[in-house]
Amino acid sequence: YSNPAGLAFLPKDGLQVALTIQSAYQTRDIAATSPLWTMDGQNTVRKYEGKASAPVIPSIHAVYKKGDWAFSGSFAIVGGGGKASFDKGLPMFDAAAISLVNTIGQGMLSPNQYTINSAMEGRQYIYGFQLGASYKINEHFAVFAGARMNYFTGGYKGFLDINLKEGVAEQLGAEIVKKLMAAGMTLEQAQQAALQKSQQLNDAKLKLDCDQTGWGLTPIIGIDAKFGKLNLAAKYEFKANMNIENDTHDITAPDAAADFMAPYQNGVNTPSDLPAMLSLAASYEILPSLRASVEYHFFDDKNAGMADGKQKTLKHGTHEYLAGVEWDINKLFTVSGGYQKTDYGLSDAFQSDTSFSCDSYSVGFGGRINFTEALSLDVAYFWTTYSDYTKENVRGLGASIDKDVYSRTNKVFGVSVNYKF
């Protein structure tokens, strides 16, 4: 159904339905190098591991063909990063916590005198409901027009606690009193000020529970051309304007972290457009039982609105290059294999701990069992190999000593049942 115009060339009239279930397993890891973590003159690396799994991702596709017309529809998860959990938090939160402690503690606390406990869970799903019509103009050409309604649901849950180690509070209090008395305060005034500082440290906790929703409409057009054994196709999806609105149930933070937490405040709207997409494809029937295809996708990310206009920092939109082969072993079995290379045009300013991408290539294999002329079963598996992305000078401490390395893995298994009524 990536070539909806081609549905008009289905050999038989009637209804066809495909029910698909996919299982996806991903990791999203960050290796953060910084002198902040210890403040002892050494650069250390903290590793933050994110895990995401979606055991059941359902989708349904259907088409009804009558004469030169074909009417199609689908419901599926068409985007979003799924659900990911970082049990040890994220580098951006630890760096913010250390900065907060330095501000409140007036630089008199080192990281070995306190502990930071944090965790973050994020989720992003885009559900798509698509309807359209295909029309066969003649024996060579068919066209398609339709639209997809996209509904976004997501959010973040997380916490961050700062705890002074045993005896540190008393030591800090004595240091603050000594410093303030040297500045001219009386003992009583200095003790009162030190008590306030200690209370500020005890209150230096972050907590977030925020849901996000939004929707947008994607108009779609397509064309399909058949010339003997050669099939050419093109599809264009227009940009969907979408704003994500916060429904924040809990947001707890000290005043010093107000700017840091501002994007998660209740009612805040953030642009999150779905980019326009162009798809071009060609397939050729080498033998009656053997077919090969190549395909190209372009996502116009640089012109899709994002938070703080970060899309402008991309070097270019996303390019995807695909190739595949399909072989009918006999009337009962069909096998296939495919390859995809993805280039996002990434930049340091585009990448962040809560949203990062890595260039990649994917390899997949599949098979079909034709139980009857009407009933068939598809199975497929693919994995993605990502190129690590290194972002330098993340916390403004110098490129050579301050960097984050983003890495990912992805494995997906799918099963589909197809029936022709």
Regions found by a protein language model. Give the residues of each.
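N-terminal, post-signal peptide beta-strand-biased segments of exported outer-membrane/organellar beta-barrel
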Residues: 1-80, 356, 382
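Outer-membrane beta-barrel porins/channels
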Residues: 12, 57-58, 63-421
